[in-house]
Amino acid sequence: LLTLSDQPQWKVVVGGSQTYIPLLTAPLAGRVTTEAGVEHVSRGESSVTLTFADRPPQSFDEVVFACHGDQVLSILSDPTDAERDVFRRFRTTTNLACLHTDASLLPARPRARASWNYLLDGDPDTPPTVTYDLNRLQRLSTPEQYCLTLNPRVAIDESSVLGRYVYRHPLYDQDAIEAQARW
């Protein structure tokens, strides 16, 4: 993907997610429950009941699980053998993300920079350090260089750190591919 003379252009929606999220969610207004801590999901004859951490249970015709497979198994009260087999195959990896303004994690020459900049340490068991050039990705016209680094293995100037976050990302391995094919 990276060449010095012909770099691919990252496509973004004008106005960002503030533009398209309201358009996508408007038809769902009043029909979708979000930001509710679900403790259990149980199936009935004609409905699915959600037990919440901080509100009374609610029943629905259908439920969409927007979470990792292990999370489905921890809240689904009565998973079938097939569901257990499928959802246990979706594994995740934990990643530390650091939002910062330390441009030293990008290549020194601006023309050598890409949207995603990888730093490998040679150990196949260690995830790469990836620094996203947010100015390039988000077309930011600011004098400050904004970066998001995953799994930093080199020191980031602490005065430049705007936030640290821990994420779990799905592993796209053979188990996941086979599980998707079964569902």
Label each region the model flagged:
Residues E39-Y172:
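Mid-domain catalytic core of redox enzymes
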Residues L1-S42:
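Active-site/ligand-binding neighborhood in enzyme catalytic cores
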Residues G15, N151-R153, I177:
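Short, loop-centered acidic/histidine patches that primarily coordinate divalent metals
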Residues Q174-W183:
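Short glycine/proline-rich, acidic loop/turn segments that cap or connect secondary-structure elements
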